[in-house]
Regions:
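Active-site donor-nucleotide binding/catalytic segment of nucleotide-sugar enzymes
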Residues: 2-8, 104-107
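Helix-loop module immediately N-terminal to the HCX5R catalytic loop
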Residues: 88-96
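C-terminal functional extensions of proteins
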Residues: 50, 54-57, 62-63, 71-72, ...
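Active-site rim loops that border cofactor/substrate pockets in soluble metabolic enzymes
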Residues: 21-54, 59-61, 67-76, 80-87, ...
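Glycine-rich phosphate/diphosphate-binding loop of Rossmann-like nucleotide-binding domains
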Residues: 5-23
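Glycine/threonine-rich flexible loop motifs
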Residues: 12, 66-67
Length: 148
């Protein structure tokens, strides 16, 4: 079997478990075929969202990965989870009275978008930031020149 690289890790596990029951001799991939960034972000969102009043995923509206992160946040207990494209989409009126807001980004969203989003929130409300590292990622990609 093969899986889509941006599927929900939990959904994929459920499907694979069902396949193994129905087809005990099924051949598995040699290695994990869900990308590391997807797996890591889903684990982080799952850990953080359960403690948030509101959760934002920064990413493209047509990004399967970003959409899955919103689903994971909701499944983890934060029903007020939204996908936003950039800081200009920030619904200030929704966060004014929130005590805890979670933020993550899709695997392909540049870090500068996350920083811009946080800066936009800082302009509107007093903010204490706590970075939560669930899994250390050692891979670094160069930011495209247009985004610097």
């Amino acid at each position: 079997y093969v899986t889509q690289t941006t599927l929900s890790v939990d959904d994929t596990k459920n499907i694979v478990d069902a396949l193994k029951i129905k087809f005990p001799e099924i051949k598995e991939p040699v290695k994990e075929d869900i990308c590391y960034a997807t797996t890591n972000r889903q684990a982080a969102v799952k850990n953080i969202a359960k403690n948030c009043e509101m959760f934002f995923v920064i990413g493209s509206r047509n990004s399967s990965n970003s959409q899955r992160l919103v689903e994971v946040a909701k499944q983890s207990g934060c029903n007020r989870s939204e996908l936003i494209h950039s800081e200009s989409d920030l619904p200030i009126e929704k966060i004014i009275n929130c005590k805890t807001i979670g933020i993550s980004s899709g695997a392909s969203a540049p870090e500068v978008l996350v920083k811009n989003f946080i800066n936009k929130i800082k302009e509107k409300i007093n903010l204490e930031i706590e970075e939560v590292e669930i899994i250390k990622e050692n891979i670094i990609f160069k930011t495209p020149g247009k985004l610097n």
